[in-house]
């Protein structure tokens, strides 16, 4: 469909559905061109007019000035379309100089550098020649045999010049055909028969048995298949004609000093034209061949420089003086390239920026806009109004009035900005709340005023931050700003669904102060009041204080609507606060009748939102803010040195710890513990000491003084306004342990605190951590920003496309338990999800949830009462929608608190939710000033509630002291309540002492087990005598003498380093009384393999008792964990990288058996399946690595066989996608939870869904796929449905996990991939394969200049589609596609339409009755 332009020439409207890219043929280049360029001249140096026939020729590219030919004969619009007979220039708009292309006819063909050097080399793949050979033909003057005829050469053989000359002497010029340069490559490409090559490769694939050869053949076959499908011709990769960019895209700009600034492209074109012309002249002179070859090589290099300077094989001899010239590729790629700089990131007009200041007098939907700024931003609106009212007859006069700031202008400005929202944005915009709409309020001054409550959403503070203002111009833009982006609509955070418009800092302090209750003297009478006005009078007169205890008669509404009155004990402050609460049955006085900290305030705002809706919440928040500020200033809370109270017990605690540390040193001197054990114990002891001092300090600081006043610093920290216990600990307790930059902990702590002041030595120790924090901040911000960019890129095309995909699948949601403690309850995990199946109460069998029902707060309460421990819910991972997700699989839109609406861009929201805290966290490493944040190691298991014990896999032996020692690697203690429901589950490590038995009842705080957290023991199961096998001094064990103690330990060393150690298998064997190897309970020999680094506790020939520790493996010294370690971990998980030393995962259920020999210095482990008919599965464990299974142990599919992090790809292969999801969610959430950041699981699931989009073909069935090829899951499933219908063999495949970078580059859209990374590579591949971009995602639509297919754009697309349908198809399309989106409105429009023209179903939906298209 073509649209006529104002000027009369046509431009294509945006009515395309997809974009296709392919290699341009010489014919198409000539067809696009308006003329050939043969001259390098640009402008005349005297007249500055453009030269004819040159690079800026007006005859080819169009006139320089609008409607004016070069010689000036025709100079008016009326001559438009005439070609001047004198100068040959067409009279038209000068805009055509941005569109019209020229071309250069090359005398000699030239290879396109992209297809030659972008790996894998496409020309090389088609010709089956290595890239080096092709380069030698193109650049070094080697020859290639085109037709050997009678000679012994083979076709395509590369020969040097000397060999060519000898052959020519021997066989004559006619004896064979061999060529050099691009002509030779072109000739080979022309002669290719791709169909025959494909058939040959397919037959070779069937016959070959070598895996290496198979991979090579598959790679080439895939390239050839793609090329055949694309419809390109091989010889098009060799250029015979080059297109020339329109001149206005490579302009000549004159600088202030009169010198011209020339675009780099013009240099490239000049070089090419010069060399091309020189070659043309040379050929006519018939010079020696070497001169021609040299000139052709130079032409090849010039063209390489134009297309891609970075891939040139030479460096120009003049490079030093000329500098690097940007090529066409450089203009596309990178942050400054065309894609990211101009297409995805445009500058915006009608915008301004200024410093922000606090505006406590504003309402939540308002912001203060300086008058001067508003005047400039709304200038056109003011002009039109002034003109309309007749105040200024012309625009010019209106502008003058605005400049001179006449009084009438201000009145008009007031009118213009009324109800006209503006957008405020603060960089960096890490999530969608970084850009919100406000109603402007005109203010004096030059700074923008911001409402204090939106600061946390913008992450803004008032220490000099700047913000940008944007004016939405069109009515649609204003409508979207008001309805969707207004700050009052952004009460909840999209990442976790909790309120983000929440009081903080001094507001919290004010409310905390207001709700405090002072301790009453025993003889003091409690005053009673019946009305609020009396309380206010008493306060005003100073009879009572806001925190005095009073009795008050409270009227409240029962659930049945009756009013009851009761007397409550409260304070005047709490009554004042109660006044601002909205009336609702769920909001009771108990909410206020307590001391409110930030946690309680947040949950109150949340409850008000859920109960009373958005409007009430906004009003309540504003009132809350005013109260908070008022009482924070009235309270007079200050911060003084004396407020930091140092506990009296500090000296005693430090003395105590020092004594214990001396003890550890003595144990170390006596050789009872190793160096690393001593270090770990010392660090642990100081951690305990610091915690004790901190506890005593908090106790001392939280007490009121003689006047009953609370400590100011305690109030600040306790209320959550500012500061934390760990900061207070450093101020008034003890700074504690510090970390080195490497992450290790320095074992001498800082005993002083900041009030006492640090000694020089202590200060020096503390600088490590503080400086590391600052360096980290700078580095990690970039890392985190890059992670967000990759996440957005991988998830940008994931939107909600339908209401229900009808899947029966889902994932099981459970509470998250870490280290025995519940860190995320089942309530929080299932809230806002949709039930996948009908769920019943296990006791009463009452239906709690029906399939497809949204789980809201009420349903969560039912689940909790029923005591369920797992619920199957719908998940984005199992959604079966095409091109997106359905509403039910996604569940609640967290920012609204209701089911997600169709068209929501959930992918981008997920990416922002995961990426935004990353940036926050990286900036937060130094807030605790580098003190080591590390908990005391867990060394025992204590019951946290009264329960009954159930032991799982508890294989125990009794040692000589009568202790029960756990011998199982998978022992678990489960705590059951009185009904038998599981309340907690703890794993007990191998070698622990167990104090409980199966079925035993335990009381809260009972110790159930304990173990040494710093070593992994190896323990005997039987009594007997130890014998060393393959433990040879100097080869596999060494006496390691500790210089500081003089005691030596026998330590296992790496025996592979010795020649005689190659076949050793160092182990300890247990002999029975007869001197034979003892057999264990599972009929296996009692032999114990020892890993490298193990310390032997027994001598050769020593008697041991069952349960004795014969070897111990020291654990690493524990490093501090913060997000610095956490962010790289998140990146590693999302990039699906294989961990360096990943654990081996068992593929089957079965029994462990150790191999008797080694394979290439690796130890064999066999898993014998339970089903004896199946073969054993073999695994190779690196020698000296500690296996966490014993011989004869039963392992389940997916269990780990050795220490380390498992590989995600293994989890997916062995256990499937659901297990992978649960592993990744728990690992990622662990990192964020450590920083107290809450992210909903569904965001991680959305990203995971995008990572699992591809499958690997294991059997191609009756298709053209190749084994091992990667294909889109949707595509394969669609193909399989067709194959099954046709009765053919379907494709077999396995899911694969791709990292986010790889998934982004592997997307269906080449435009999106090219704008992400590796631009030239992506475009080369796309053009070579003739790819189509269906324009489904957000990025590609932004790039082609359309409305994105999300939100409003999604609906508009659907409506436009409807408008294009035949009338007969309206109702069908509407019922299938639009009813669920448009709801009742659509039904009304259909009905209106039918009423307007009866008998024509759905016609009036557009056109007559309903004006949807006008909208």
Curated annotation (Swiss-Prot):
Its EC number is 2.7.7.6. One of its GO terms (biological process) is DNA-templated transcription. DNA-dependent RNA polymerase catalyzes the transcription of DNA into RNA using the four ribonucleoside triphosphates as substrates. Mg(2+) binds at residues 461, 463, 465. Zn(2+) 2 binds at residues 805, 879, 886, 889. It comes from Anaplasma marginale (strain Florida). SMART domains: RPOLA_N. One of its GO terms (cellular component) is DNA-directed RNA polymerase complex. This is DNA-directed RNA polymerase subunit beta'. It comes from the Bacteria. Binds 1 Mg(2+) ion per subunit. The keyword NAD does not apply.
